Amino acid sequence: ICACCKVESKNEGKKNEVFNNYTFRGLGNKGVLPWKCNSLDMKYFRAVTTYVNESKYEKLKYKRCKYLNKETVDNVNDMPNSKKLQNVVVMGRTNWESIPKKFKPLSNRINVILSRTLKKEDFDEDVYIINKVEDLIVLLGKLNYYKCFIIGGSVVYQEFLEKKLIKKIYFTRINSTYECDVFF
């Protein structure tokens, strides 16, 4: 499972820099992003969360099944209405609600919303609703997907980090400091 987020870093220019307790982890201010998202940010996010290399899929699938202690790797289902391999994006309810309607669900990705209050009946969109992190593990065991990305918000990041389920973090450096009231 990977995570996508933005952070400010003093190590500008370093590749593969360490993401640690000293990394600024501001995510929001008064219910919105504290910085203006530009088209490059959105293109990068889309590129990362939609990229699929089908030639590496079998190896990834094998590693996942081994990690999840599954006996068989053949007992997976395709997502309805999806003919091609896609990534999974997992977000909290607030994050889902912040996405403009014209972009819902995020295209070319399997959208999963983590919420204790929402129900599948509340949605016209083709999305999965889960109530807890453990439900995602069960769902992922049934889906045919390439990678899984956690895309926020702060509570969702915290839950996955605390359970040590995030293997890799993709983050964008910000060259300024912003006032934030939501962190992870």
Identify the meaning behind each predicted range:
Residues 1-184:
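Enzymes that bind and transform nitrogen-containing heteroaromatic metabolites
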